[in-house]
A protein has these predicted regions:
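Short, solvent-exposed loop/beta-turn-alpha elements that line the ligand-binding surface or hinge
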Residues: 35, 107-120, 163, 182-191, ...
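Extracytoplasmic "Venus flytrap"/periplasmic binding protein-like
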Residues: 48-120, 155-157, 261-262, 269-270, ...
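A structural signal for short loop-to-beta-strand junctions that line the ligand-binding cleft
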Residues: 76-77, 83-85, 113-152, 189-191, ...
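Hinge/lid segment of periplasmic solute-binding proteins
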Residues: 89-143, 204, 291-295, 360-364, ...
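Extracytoplasmic/periplasmic solute-binding protein
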Residues: 131-139, 144, 169-222, 268
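Glycine-centered hinge/linker elements that transmit conformational signals in sensory
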Residues: 173-175, 218-252, 297
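Long, aromatic- and glycine/proline-rich binding clefts that accommodate carbohydrate-like moieties
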Residues: 295, 344-395, 402
Length: 429
């Protein structure tokens, strides 16, 4: 109840504007990749900090670019001696920044600020830890789940997915929801949607007992081409090659926007999803155009449920000019007030366990409870562990295209890709 009260109170505080700037203020720079909606919400988050720190203003510097470009911009500014005071760190950038030694270890500062790391979700916190060092305080995260259209389930008389469903259940439902709804002989509603990009099928691979890399992250052979991985890849690409339960673009390189638009228009019943799509879904649910539910990623019978989490955190450059203030700002942005205000935007789950639980208690849709349950089975992505992951991830769609477009056997395609990734990873050792 106390957490729920904090959440409501935080929203009220977040609605207030910051005090008017005065001469002689110290300006701190917060670097992130926020779009205009996120930047507006972050200004609400920053207002209480500026109010409680007279003489301090915080200026957001939003990149408005992709993650790779953002990383290079930040690293360049650090190398040039003009780092931001605080930066938003994506999980995929943790290895590059920690390997270069450009981030401040926050652990020695946290006791003085009263920051108890036990309050954070331990899996999410581990994304930003290296031994005893803490290089960022978790801001928020999402596990990957399934988003589904309740109306399509109801029209077909299919019960909503339960927490412990299997691949067999998913396939049976997807077939039942792939339909010719107007009787013209053409399928115009599909059970699900396929995507060749790894971040959207990682959870499917793991929930089938497979993986891309072996322990340590420096070899793919023996893991990507293992029997479990091959079977998971065969099953996932089989949505296209065997089951015909997905809309098929002529080259299968449809964008995320294409699949989302098909979902919003009632043409796709189930979609692999993260919390980051909730802000896009809300307008459709609030005006009654969609009734949406979420469910955990189903697992292969005999394999344990698993999913992947994607997270971001607040870091301080080792060369930050205002080190004390920078650490205070990072700690504030990752603490309960900021996370509660930010939760209203729906982009992510709060990384503080109590804040996430409070959000779930207040959520009348039941969505947040599903994300919380999914996080119990979540793993840290490889991108948070090895620096060359961007190159690995960029190569993986080629394997999927070999299978779905060129009709290469998944075992052959996986073996080819494993050898290719071995060579790529060897260059970085």
């Amino acid at each position: 109840m106390k957490c729920a009260f904090l959440f409501v109170a935080a929203l009220a505080v977040g609605a207030c504007g910051a005090a008017a700037p005065a001469d002689g203020r110290t300006e701190l720079e917060l670097a992130n990749w926020a779009d205009y909606r996120e930047a507006d919400l972050e200004n609400r988050v920053l207002a209480p900090f500026e109010w409680s720190h007279p003489g301090i203003t915080v200026q957001q510097q939003s990149a408005g670019t992709g993650q790779a470009e953002y990383r290079e911009r930040i690293l360049t500014s650090i190398a040039a001696g003009h780092p931001p005071d605080v930066l938003l760190l994506d999980n995929i950038d943790v290895p590059a920044f920690t390997n270069r030694g450009v981030l401040l270890d926050l652990a020695p500062y946290l006791p003085r600020l009263g920051i108890d790391l036990a309050r954070y979700d331990p899996t999410v916190l581990d994304v930003f830890r290296r031994g005893a060092a803490v290089y960022a305080l978790p801001k928020g995260y999402t596990p990957m789940v399934i988003m589904y259209n309740k109306d399509l389930f109801d029209q077909a008389g299919i019960p909503y997915p339960t927490g412990d469903w299997t691949w067999d259940d998913f396939l049976r439902i997807a077939h039942a929801l792939t339909r010719d709804t107007d009787g013209d002989g053409q399928v115009d509603q599909w059970g699900t949607a396929y995507d060749r990009r790894y971040f959207l099928w990682a959870a499917w691979l793991w929930s089938g007992g497979g993986d891309i890399l072996c322990a340590g992250g420096w070899r793919a052979s023996g893991c990507l081409d293992s029997p479990a991985s091959i079977e998971a890849i065969r099953w996932y690409t089989g949505w296209v090659t065997r089951d015909s339960i997905v809309p098929r673009a002529h080259n299968l390189r449809r964008s995320l926007g294409d699949n989302l638009r098909l979902f919003y228009s009632g043409k796709v019943a189930m979609l692999t999803s993260g919390h980051f799509w909730i802000p896009n879904v809300r307008p459709y649910t609030e005006d009654g155009r969609l009734r949406v539910g979420f469910a955990e990623i189903p697992h292969r019978a005999g394999s344990a449920p698993q999913t992947v989490i994607y997270a971001s955190g607040l870091a301080v450059p080792a060369t930050a000019l205002h080190r004390k203030l920078s650490v205070q700002l990072a700690a504030y942005l990752a603490d309960s007030l900021a996370q509660s205000i930010r939760a209203a935007g729906g982009l992510e789950l709060p990384s503080l366990t109590a804040a996430a639980q409070a959000l779930a208690i207040l959520d009348t849709t039941g969505w947040e409870a599903v994300f919380l349950r999914a996080s119990r089975h979540a793993r840290i992505p490889w991108g948070a562990r090895i620096e060359p992951w961007r190159e690995v991830e960029a190569a993986l769609p080629d394997m999927m295209d070999r299978i779905t477009l060129e009709h290469v056997d998944p075992a052959v395609a996986a073996r080819e890709m494993a050898l290719r990734l071995d060579r790529l990873l060897a260059q970085d050792q």
